[in-house]
């Protein structure tokens, strides 16, 4: 045995002198990893005896450790409770490759204590078993401690069992012999959960030491592991456990079922102060160890249990016991299954054989000894021949048995696979049927909707035809009446004339002689002086005159009334009551057919009512039908003509006495500086829950006088083209005084929101075309008709026909709009979306009304015109953001619920009591909005630009570290949305009330606090559009940036402890986050493209250098580059390359159980490496997939159901999978709707899906698929703009960095959780994230980069 040979010091061990194992031992299979090498099950070639063989590379660095391990094993393994060392061999390798050392040790076939626990019901051992195993461990430790050796890694995995239930300690890789003088160590080695507090302290404090009593703490933890199935704190991260072990009280058994003796034993082992912890010999005398029942009985029970476990597994010849190392593992109990190979007898003989091999080359000193040995050899050979014959027979039987088992297993596997295939096929068939059924239902639903839509349109057309016929009949009837009346009047005049003539004749005949003049009465005479016949004639004329054409002054007075709504208010609702009640119209003066009385509580005039002759009956019926059908009309022409010749529309209708609807000219209120808007005031209630949908204005239509020939005679028309006001201009579109009818009623009221659209919709073509800034004026059909009509035509039929045609068209659009309910989305981040508060007339009972201004940010389009960022003109697709009519307060939030997960902000004004001039600045509550365009003012101080600025507390920085130096500096990012009130449900009418109530929570407090300011602002037309936000700092997630500007572009970064390693175009730096933000240069003139810190392995993985090699840097070497406190480290090379890989594009480190995989994307291949612990301590090749059809740009690795490894990679065409076992490659998602190449952004393996489902992000979309290419969710994640960088963060969210905003979305649903707007467009790149902090970098035009970090802690996310 090893003990027979004289103990040699480390220097005396000559590794090169050891024999080659070829022909003596062969390796069977890998069973685990030791601290410095891999452990194999091996077999002695001649005898078939099994042995555990640890294989290690002999490198210069680790030669001392290897010699130390050999020395330890040779000296101290000769004990019944320690796995015996048999011998060592050297396997020579060709030059350039390290030689391999084979350490041959006793093989323990029953596995480890951890395996025993796993295979026991309830994962707990019986108390007498625990006592037996603890006693055996103590015996082994006692032997080591007597020889001044600390094991330093006692745990369940390092305590093995033989098939006879003998207990053996293994893994001396970390054992250390105590110096005879000092007797203490201060190195940090061991497994975190079993580690003693004093061992952990030695890492934190270099002066701390420990001794052999640390093994007794580990024994106590192992006893708890045997009792409870796992060590304390095992559910925590190892680093967290290391932090807590010295700080927490000593652990105890949770259950009260254990005996007092056992609990006392645990307490004795787990004493935190190691100086007070009992010694090994004292613990041997503890009642729990000393007073044990029949040991033989316990061993029999254990042996039976081991045998039963083997039978249950069907004697699978799979992984044997995993000889685990202690390289700061993150999990404590991942080992292989126990061996199923029977441990053959004759171990002592085998030991003698090994001894003979070791002593064969020794000189025989004495002839007598030689003769004795020869005689002994002859006897042994005779004995050996007998044994060999027996063993050969047993081995053949065993081989036959194994063949039978393998055959049986193979059949079972095939059967199982076949069943799985059947199940999968059945499941796929079921899913296909389900999909077909769903598709059929969708198609039926779609057809049904189409039919309903067509039916509705037919009904509307029929109603329109009926109304048109009714109007024509009424008109003809009136004409006939007028004609008859005229004929009657002519007849009467003729009779009067005849009567007068006959009277004259009579008088002449009566007085033929007298030539007296006839009596002529003067017009100025009093009625009493007129003769009776004249009075009679006058009376008749007066009666007739009541039905004669109107007097000019009457017309003039009516028309100049400012409160007559212009045509642009058609289809708007100016009252707050539900619009389903038919309009109550005053009787029409039959001789003034062009004017219709307007009642504010009912709906405003329709397009055809506002100008033409409208009989009362036909009008009422038509209006009622219109309102019942729909409350909303799209705004197809809202901004389609920036230079249309129409005067500015009034921004609100003055409150006035409801008993006198039509004011006289002298009642016109004094004019105030006009703030014109791009929409009619009647739109203000377009989103109230009462009507449930937006009512769009008919912008650009002529006011009432423009289409009425009578009015044209009465008033001059001034048609000055209004120029389009750009967002940077300061000209105010004030109205000339020669337009009293259009300006008369305008007050600085609140604005209705212009619903900005993001999508070009098929059913609203006029809305979908962007308007160029210098487009010539185009006059709409109605306008051209109204403006060019020279005088009153003989018949109104043509005018009525035209208006009815326009009405029919709008009604069709209305119905399409109502059916489709399109989302109103913010088209451009630069468009101001100020909340608008309606301030039109309230109901007479003073009841407040609620409406919501919503902004949809989930779909910010990629259709922004090319000149938008650089020029002053701010365009939206399908809708010009700043019209000739100022949109400073017109761009309010509007819209309905989004079908696509669109974020809504609701506002209720129910808390507010509005006065006649309420909300003159257009702000009700303030949300944090984009701050992209500077506020401009007209000479009179009137705000005229399209985008107001909203500054918030979160934008005003209090310290120099937040976005610059001074507190007045504006933030680079503006939190845009409050996620507490966002709604992303599908569009259902019955959900609108819920949204309104959610809105109340958001703005009620804000509205009250802003009320005083707004009341003051309402009195004047110059408004402060920079109100101070009253929300505290903590309400919004913070974004901060470090002052340091990097001269070259930041490409990647990784957290190392609390500090940040930053990789740039020309070097690697460390940003000291714990101190003053100082930056240390670590490596110069080398490009770093990607990096990850693996602190447990002491490495930094990078893609770096001109050739994009995969380099692994040692963290200890990098640390020494800053501290320069270890000359030994400085001498060594600080990095190694992984393989000979060049041209790496992307990699991903994937941790699965205790294995760390490195998946690497190359030019047309994917390589998989796996981390090999000491003695290798490097990534070693695992699998390679070359000559791929698609070039991988992005890679990830998933483990399906804990069994099948699959590589997922993204390319320019889509996303693909490689089955690691078979090497087969197939597509899982190809976006066919995108022509040309795509940019893959991210692959997110979804949690709780057994590695089967993922979210793949590309371009501005994300799709949910599984590893077989099936779409798993009907949802498509839609970014608001094309992101430059996308990353999954561990709060189960995904973030996208665009040039205009940062979006945060839920990984599970794709719903928007928040948006951060940038003050200006900038390119951002994700760097890394940990816990609640996300780091990213900006790149400016000058090439300087800065590091930002965003804190998304839970509390602020809840309040945000």
From Swiss-Prot:
Q: Which locations, inside or outside the cell, does it occupy?
A: Nucleus; Cytoplasm; Recycling endosome; Cytoplasm, Cytoskeleton
Under the heading SMART domains, the entry gives: CNH, S_TKc
Associated disorder: Intellectual developmental disorder, autosomal recessive 54: A disorder characterized by significantly below average general intellectual functioning associated with impairments in adaptive behavior and manifested during the developmental period. MRT54 patients manifest intellectual disability, delayed speech and hyperactivity.
Q: Which reaction equation describes what this protein catalyses?
A: L-seryl-[protein] + ATP = O-phospho-L-seryl-[protein] + ADP + H(+); L-threonyl-[protein] + ATP = O-phospho-L-threonyl-[protein] + ADP + H(+)
What is the similarity comment for this entry? Answer: Belongs to the protein kinase superfamily. STE Ser/Thr protein kinase family. STE20 subfamily.
Enzyme active site: 153 (proton acceptor)
Stretches with biased composition (Basic and acidic residues): 288-307, 652-669, 775-789, 814-827, 908-917
Q: Per the record, which residues fall in region Disordered?
A: 284-347, 398-440, 539-589, 601-801, 814-878, 908-927, 933-998
Q: In which tissues is it expressed?
A: Expressed ubiquitously. Highest levels observed in heart, brain and skeletal muscle. Expressed in normal colonic epithelia and colorectal cancer tissues.
Question: Where Phosphoserine occurs along the chain?
Answer: 324, 326, 560, 570, 600, 608, 610, 640, 678, 680, 688, 701, 707, 720, 764, 766, 769, 959
Q: What is the main EC category here?
A: transferase
The record's SUPFAM superfamilies line, in alphabetical order, gives: Protein kinase-like (PK-like)
Q: Which InterPro entries does the protein's record reference? A: CNH_dom (IPR001180), Kinase-like_dom_sf (IPR011009), Prot_kinase_dom (IPR000719), Protein_kinase_ATP_BS (IPR017441), Ser/Thr_kinase_AS (IPR008271), STE20_Ser-Thr_kinase (IPR051700)
Disulphide bonds in the chain: none
Q: Give the modified residues of type Phosphothreonine.
A: 187, 581
| Name listed for the protein in its UniProt record | TRAF2 and NCK-interacting protein kinase
Give the EC number(s) under which this enzyme is classified. Answer: 2.7.11.1
Comp. bias intervals (Acidic residues): 317-335, 834-847, 987-996
Spell out the Low complexity composition-biased ranges.
Answer: 720-755
What kind of modification does the protein receive after translation?
Autophosphorylated. Autophosphorylation is activated by RAP2A and induces association to the cytoskeletal fraction.
Please state every residue range assigned to the domain named Protein kinase.
25-289
> What is this protein's function?
Serine/threonine kinase that acts as an essential activator of the Wnt signaling pathway. Recruited to promoters of Wnt target genes and required to activate their expression. May act by phosphorylating TCF4/TCF7L2. Appears to act upstream of the JUN N-terminal pathway. May play a role in the response to environmental stress. Part of a signaling complex composed of NEDD4, RAP2A and TNIK which regulates neuronal dendrite extension and arborization during development. More generally, it may play a role in cytoskeletal rearrangements and regulate cell spreading.
Do you know which CDD domains this protein is assigned to? STKc_TNIK (cd06637)
């Amino acid at each position: 045995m090893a003990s027979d040979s004289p103990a040699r010091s480390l220097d005396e061990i000559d590794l090169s002198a050891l024999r080659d194992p070829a022909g003596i031992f062969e390796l069977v299979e890998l069973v685990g990893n030791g601290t410095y090498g891999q452990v194999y099950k091996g077999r002695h070639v001649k005898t078939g005896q099994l042995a555990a063989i640890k294989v290690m590379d002999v490198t210069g660095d680790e030669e001392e450790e290897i010699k130390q391990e050999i020395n330890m094993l040779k000296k101290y393994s000769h004990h019944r409770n320690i796995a015996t060392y048999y011998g060592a061999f050297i396997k020579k390798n060709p030059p350039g490759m390290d030689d391999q050392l084979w350490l041959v040790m006793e093989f323990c076939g029953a596995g480890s204590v951890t395996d025993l626990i796993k295979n026991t019901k309830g994962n707990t051992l019986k108390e007498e078993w625990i006592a037996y195993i603890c006693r055996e461990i103590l015996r082994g430790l006692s032997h080591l401690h007597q020889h001044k050796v600390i094991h330093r890694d006692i745990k369940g995995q390092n305590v093995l069992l033989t098939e006879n239930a003998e207990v053996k300690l293994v893994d001396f890789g970390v054992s250390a012999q105590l110096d005879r003088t000092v007797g203490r160590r201060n190195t940090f080695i061991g497994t975190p959960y079993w580690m003693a507090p004093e061992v952990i302290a030695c890492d934190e404090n270099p002066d701390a030491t420990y001794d052999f009593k640390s093994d007794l703490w580990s024994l106590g933890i192992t006893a708890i592991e045997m009792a409870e199935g796992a060590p304390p704190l095992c559910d925590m991260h190892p680093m967290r456990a290391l932090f807590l072990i010295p700080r927490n009280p000593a652990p105890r058994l949770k259950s009260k079922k254990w005996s007092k003796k056992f609990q006392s034993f645990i307490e004795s082992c787990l004493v935190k102060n190691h100086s007070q912890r009992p010694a090994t010999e004292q613990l041997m005398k503890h009642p729990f160890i000393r007073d044990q029942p029949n040991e033989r009985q316990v061993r029999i029970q254990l042996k039976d249990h081991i045998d039963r476990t083997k039978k249950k597994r069907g004697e699978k010849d799979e992984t044997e016991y995993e000889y685990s190392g202690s390289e700061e593992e993150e999990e404590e109990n991942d080992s292989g299954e126990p061996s199923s190979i029977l441990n053959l007898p004759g171990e002592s003989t085998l030991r003698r054989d090994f001894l003979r091999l070791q002593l064969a080359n020794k000189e025989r000193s004495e002839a007598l000894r030689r003769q004795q040995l020869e005689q002994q050899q002859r006897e042994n050979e005779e004995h050996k021949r007998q044994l060999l014959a027996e063993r050969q027979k047993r081995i053949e039987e065993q081989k036959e048995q194994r063949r039978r088992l393998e055959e049986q297993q193979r059949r079972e596997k095939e059967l199982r696979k076949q069943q799985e295939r059947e199940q999968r096929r059945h499941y796929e068939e079921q899913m296909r049927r389900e999909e077909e059924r769903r598709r059929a239902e969708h198609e039926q639903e779609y057809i049904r909707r189409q039919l309903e839509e067509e039916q509705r349109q037919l009904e509307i057309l029929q109603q329109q035809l009926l109304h048109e016929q009714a109007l024509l009949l009424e008109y003809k009837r009136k004409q006939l009446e007028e004609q008859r009346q005229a004929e009657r009047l002519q007849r009467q005049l003729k009779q009067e004339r005849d009567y007068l003539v006959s009277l004259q004749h009579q008088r002449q005949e009566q007085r033929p002689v007298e030539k007296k003049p006839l009596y002529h009465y003067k017009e100025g005479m009093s009625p009493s002086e007129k003769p009776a016949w004249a009075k009679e004639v006058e009376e008749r004329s007066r009666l007739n005159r009541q039905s004669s054409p109107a007097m000019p002054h009457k017309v003039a007075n009516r028309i100049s009334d400012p409160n007559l709504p212009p045509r642009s208010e058609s289809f708007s609702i100016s009252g707050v009551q539900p619009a389903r009640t038919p309009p109550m119209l005053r009787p029409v003066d039959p001789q003034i057919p062009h004017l219709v009385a307007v009642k504010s509580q009912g709906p405003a005039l329709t397009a055809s009512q506002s100008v033409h002759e409208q009989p009362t009956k036909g009008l009422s019926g038509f209006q009622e039908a219109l309102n019942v059908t729909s409350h909303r009309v799209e705004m197809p022409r809202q901004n389609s003509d920036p230079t249309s010749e129409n005067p500015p529309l009034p921004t609100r209708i003055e409150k006035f006495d409801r008993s006198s609807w039509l004011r006289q000219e002298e009642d016109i209120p004094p004019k105030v500086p006009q703030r014109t808007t791009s929409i009619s005031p009647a739109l203000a209630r377009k989103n109230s829950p009462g009507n449930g949908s937006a009512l769009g204005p008919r912008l650009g239509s002529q006011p009432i006088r423009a289409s009425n020939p009578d009015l044209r005679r009465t008033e001059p028309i001034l048609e000055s083209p209004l120029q389009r006001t750009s967002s940077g201009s300061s000209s105010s579109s004030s109205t000339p005084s020669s337009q009293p009818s259009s300006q008369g009623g305008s007050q600085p009221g609140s604005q209705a929101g212009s619903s900005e659209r993001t999508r070009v919709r098929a059913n609203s073509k006029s809305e979908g075309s962007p308007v160029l800034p210098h487009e010539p004026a185009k006059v709409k059909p109605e306008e051209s008709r109204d403006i060019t009509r020279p005088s009153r035509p003989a018949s109104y039929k043509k005018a009525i026909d035209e208006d009815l045609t326009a009405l029919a068209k709008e009604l069709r659009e209305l119905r399409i709009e109502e059916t489709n309910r399109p989302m109103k989305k913010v088209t451009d981040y630069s468009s101001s979306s100020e909340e608008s508060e309606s301030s039109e007339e309230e109901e007479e009972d003073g009841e407040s009304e609620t409406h919501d201004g919503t902004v949809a940010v989930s779909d910010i389009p990629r259709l922004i015109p090319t000149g938008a960022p650089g020029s002053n003109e701010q365009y939206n697709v399908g809708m010009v953001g700043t019209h000739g009519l100022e949109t400073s307060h017109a761009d309010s939030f509007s819209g309905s619920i989004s079908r696509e997960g669109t974020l809504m902000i609701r506002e209720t004004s129910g808390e507010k009591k509005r006065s006649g001039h309420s909300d003159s600045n257009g702000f009700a509550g303030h949300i944090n909005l984009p701050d992209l365009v500077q506020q401009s003012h007209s000479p009179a101080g009137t705000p005229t630009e399209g985008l107001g600025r909203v500054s918030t507390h979160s934008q005003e920085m209090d310290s120099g570290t937040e976005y610059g130096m001074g507190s007045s500096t504006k933030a680079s990012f503006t939190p845009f949305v409050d996620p507490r009130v966002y709604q992303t449900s599908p569009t259902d009418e019955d959900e609108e009330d819920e949204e309104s109530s959610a809105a109340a929570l958001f703005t009620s407090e804000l509205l009250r606090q802003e009320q005083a300011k707004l009341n003051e602002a309402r009195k004047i037309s110059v408004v402060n559009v920079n109100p101070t936000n009253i929300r505290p700092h903590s309400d919004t997630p913070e974004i901060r940036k470090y002052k340091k500007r990097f001269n070259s572009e930041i490409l990647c970064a990784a957290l190392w402890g609390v500090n940040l390693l930053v990789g740039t175009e020309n070097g690697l730096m460390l940003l000291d986050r714990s101190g003053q933000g100082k930056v240390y240069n670590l490596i110069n003139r080398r490009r770093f493209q990607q990096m990850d810190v693996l602190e447990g392995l002491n490495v930094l993985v990078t893609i770096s250098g001109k050739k994009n090699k995969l380099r692994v840097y040692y963290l200890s070497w990098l640390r020494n580059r800053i501290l320069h406190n270890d000359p030994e480290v400085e001498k060594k090379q600080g990095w190694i390359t992984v393989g000979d890989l060049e041209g790496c594009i992307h990699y991903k480190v994937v941790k699965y159980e205790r294995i760390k995989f490195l998946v690497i994307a190359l030019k047309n291949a994917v390589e998989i490496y796996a981390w090999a612990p000491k003695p290798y301590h490097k990534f070693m090749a695992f699998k390679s997939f070359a000559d791929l059809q698609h070039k991988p740009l992005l890679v990830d690795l998933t483990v399906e159901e804990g069994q099948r490894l699959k590589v997922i990679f993204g390319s320019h065409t889509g996303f693909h999978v490689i089955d690691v076992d078979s090497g087969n490659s197939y597509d899982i998602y190809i976006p066919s709707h995108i022509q040309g190449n795509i940019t893959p952004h991210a692959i997110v393996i979804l949690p709780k899906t057994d590695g089967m489902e993922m979210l793949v992000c590309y371009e501005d979309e994300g799709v949910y698929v599984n590893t077989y290419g099936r779409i798993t969710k009907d949802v498509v994640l839609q970014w608001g703009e094309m992101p430059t960088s996308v990353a999954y963060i561990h709060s189960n969210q995904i973030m996208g960095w665009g040039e205009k905003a940062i979006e945060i979305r839920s990984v599970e649903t794709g719903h928007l959780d928040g948006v951060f707007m940038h003050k200006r467009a900038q390119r951002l790149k994700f760097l890394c994230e940990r816990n609640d902090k996300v780091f990213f970098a900006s790149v400016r035009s000058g090439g300087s980069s800065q590091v930002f970090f965003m804190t998304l802690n839970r509390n602020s996310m809840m309040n945000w």
